[in-house]
């Protein structure tokens, strides 16, 4: 979807039994063309290899080894098109002890530590939709890898395999916080740090109309403006978090 939005001509290969009738309301299908194919049919595979000779990128999301069994693995495809960028998306990577296991976003971000960092301290970790593993650590990392591979291919005429695993991508997104912890600037435990709900000026509050407001007044000048708008007269910065959080909640 992202590459199509950027202008790429994307052709989706769908199972023959679907007849290419994936939901027109699924945003992931926008800006794409769809063809159907029986990948277990040798003649069909040969037709796809002829198509692969003409394209810049192939990417797939099967479990490790499936494309090889179908006769469409990276070695075969790169032999057909030496400039090809071959993208692969899995949950746990192409090899390793967990590579053949099933999984979902919540599993990948659980292992990477992202899930444990989100939520209130007196509750269980809160699943943040499937934004971190599937999209941020998965699709967006793969899209960046593919674009980088294309630049390399354009400059060198050499294709390559781009291997993207959602568990690796979500761990990469956590690298800043792990570096803060190593430097002594991040504490274990939810609601213990500036960006995880500890700071009263970076949090959400329920308003009198039963809707919610998100406050992000980290910088002193914005914090001063926040106090002014809420008619809170404390002049010392920083002040008692507990004291001001109570005043801020009351103001909303």
Give the residues covered by each predicted segment.
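A short, hydrophobic C-terminal helix/tail in secreted or cell-surface proteins
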Residues: 246-252
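Conserved N-terminal glycine-rich FAD pyrophosphate-binding loop of Rossmann-like flavoproteins
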Residues: 23-29
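Short beta-strand "acidic-cap" motif of Rossmann-like dinucleotide-binding folds
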Residues: 9-13
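A structured beta-alpha segment of the ubiquitous adenosine-cofactor-binding alpha/beta core
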Residues: 31-78
């Amino acid at each position: 979807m992202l590459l199509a939005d950027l202008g790429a001509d994307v052709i989706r290969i769908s199972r023959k039994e679907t007849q290419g009738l994936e939901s027109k309301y699924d945003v992931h299908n926008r800006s794409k063309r769809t063809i159907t194919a029986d990948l277990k049919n040798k003649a069909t595979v040969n037709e796809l290899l002829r198509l692969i000779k003409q394209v810049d990128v192939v990417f797939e999301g099967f479990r490790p080894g499936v494309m090889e069994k179908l006769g469409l693995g990276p070695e075969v495809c790169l032999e057909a098109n030496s400039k090809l960028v071959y993208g692969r998306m899995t949950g746990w990577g192409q090899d390793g002890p967990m590579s053949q296991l099933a999984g979902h976003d919540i599993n990948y971000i659980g292992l990477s530590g992202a899930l444990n960092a989100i939520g209130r301290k007196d509750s269980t970790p809160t699943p943040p939709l499937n934004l971190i593993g599937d999209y941020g650590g998965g699709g967006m990392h793969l899209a960046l890898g593919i674009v980088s591979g294309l630049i390399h291919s354009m400059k060198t005429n050499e294709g390559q395999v781009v291997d993207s695993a959602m568990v690796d991508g979500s761990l990469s997104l956590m690298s800043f916080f792990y570096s803060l912890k190593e430097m002594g600037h991040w504490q274990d435990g939810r609601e213990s740090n500036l960006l995880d709900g500890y700071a009263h000026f970076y949090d959400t509050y329920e308003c009198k109309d039963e809707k919610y407001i998100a406050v992000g007044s980290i910088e002193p000048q914005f914090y001063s403006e926040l106090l002014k708008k809420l008619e809170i007269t404390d002049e010392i910065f920083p002040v008692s978090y507990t004291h001001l959080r109570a005043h801020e909640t009351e103001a909303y």
